[in-house]
């Protein structure tokens, strides 16, 4: 919204432009002759101006020799006050002034002012408005409003400049189409989203309590029962087919705002829109969608308890049939106030990335897991959708970042102990056909598919895992597909990864050699904790064509032997627990052959302390010897 308003006062000579400005500044009519063009006037923000903006008023001359200055001032302004005072100057509004503004290519609102109304009897006021102003407004849509004034009688002097201010701070053009007599599509979309967010129980109606909450949020004051009844009465008269017994439905809500626009109360609509973070172009504020949220190196983003509670409540609200899953219709309703599914979700074939029920609908467990993964991989996407979906905090100063938290950096992975993470990422590396995709399927409780489907694009799967002691964490398994070389050469990708799972087919003789070659080709993998896994253990085990067999290879690294598992075994869940445990306690899973280097800092501190103690003992001995002598 504009924080400064520049008003260019235009009109024929003798219409009273300068007198209007002087009367506003002095507060009284200036009877003495004043200069033809007044100097620029700046009015500082006061409680009487809309949104407390700074207003600059520029007087102009209509003389041909001043046309260059006039053009310059019109182009610099963001609202034009066009003044006429008699029949001749009125005719010039349509014949000269409005076409002239258009020829300059300016796109600013115009406030039409019929000045010197003291020369017209009050009985003719309505006739003047109907016969003069309305036809011009109908012909030139850029005319925002019209008003009759008198500088001599101080009639509507303050009001005319207030209209100019409001034409900039609360423009009607983005909201209402006078030609069609309807709210504009962008305005309807914004109001529809606001209705959606206000309808907390999603029953299609704003009940009395929801109306009260909406009123308090929008206008910071309660709604009296009388005002509420009047709103319902107004809507029922305007839309006879809209019942208000259950509350205000979407149709009635839109009609109410349409009435505000028709009656010149579009300021009310703007107050509502801006409380819900809409800009003058009716898009959501970028700072609202994308608040500052920096994740330090080696740290990660996760949902906070408030974030998990919000997404859980959202799921329960839209699971209308209470079957424990969100079907396509329920998902569409949930994402109605957003641009649709997040781009990354669509790219990864959501909801195939998480837990679904037998009908293929995402469950609450899968829903929370999906948002946990999104927050870990793309925290800015989560923040954007929290804004779209209406996340709110009790503290008005807090942003959507209150729904997220940042974990402690885990730069030193070799340090013993658990990392401060509830969401961890594990890359599954192995040869084609080793069973990586089947591993992801069974992780999401999918049935085993005997057909081989090669993985082209990276594929992710996320689910919750219960660690030893009962703590829950979210484990993200990612198969890299054909992008494996690019990802393994990307240090930022490796820094984000918590664990490598080297998987090979224990029934295929050439499968393990792929892992050996992979570790030689990418030595940086040695900096990541790792778990070795022998898949397809339900088949006959075969000797691997490798210099060392898997057990001997891992023993040479002082690591645990490969875990032998099969996706057809019920015990497969133990593998996921082992992966989550290794990811959250990385010092137990490092692929290295030498013992960890001594902690030299501790050694130096110990030596320093010993030296200090020895020096102190020597000084005490020397002093006692001196005293004895």
UniProtKB/Swiss-Prot annotation:
Its lineage opens with: Eukaryota, Fungi, Dikarya, Ascomycota, Pezizomycotina
Mind telling me what this protein is named?
A: Mitochondrial Rho GTPase 1
Which of this chain's residues are annotated to bind Ca(2+) 1? 199, 201, 203, 205, 210
Question: Known SMART domains for this protein?
Answer: EFh (SM00054), RAB (SM00175), RAS (SM00173), RHO (SM00174)
Any idea where the Miro domain is?
A: 2-170, 421-585
UniProt keywords, alphabetically: Calcium, GTP-binding, Hydrolase, Membrane, Metal-binding, Mitochondrion, Mitochondrion outer membrane, Nucleotide-binding, Repeat, Transmembrane, Transmembrane helix
Q: Which residues bind Ca(2+) 2?
A: 319, 321, 323, 330
Classify the protein's membrane topology as the record does. Single-pass type IV membrane protein
Q: Which residues cross the membrane?
A: 601-621
Q: Where is the EF-hand domain?
A: 186-221, 306-341
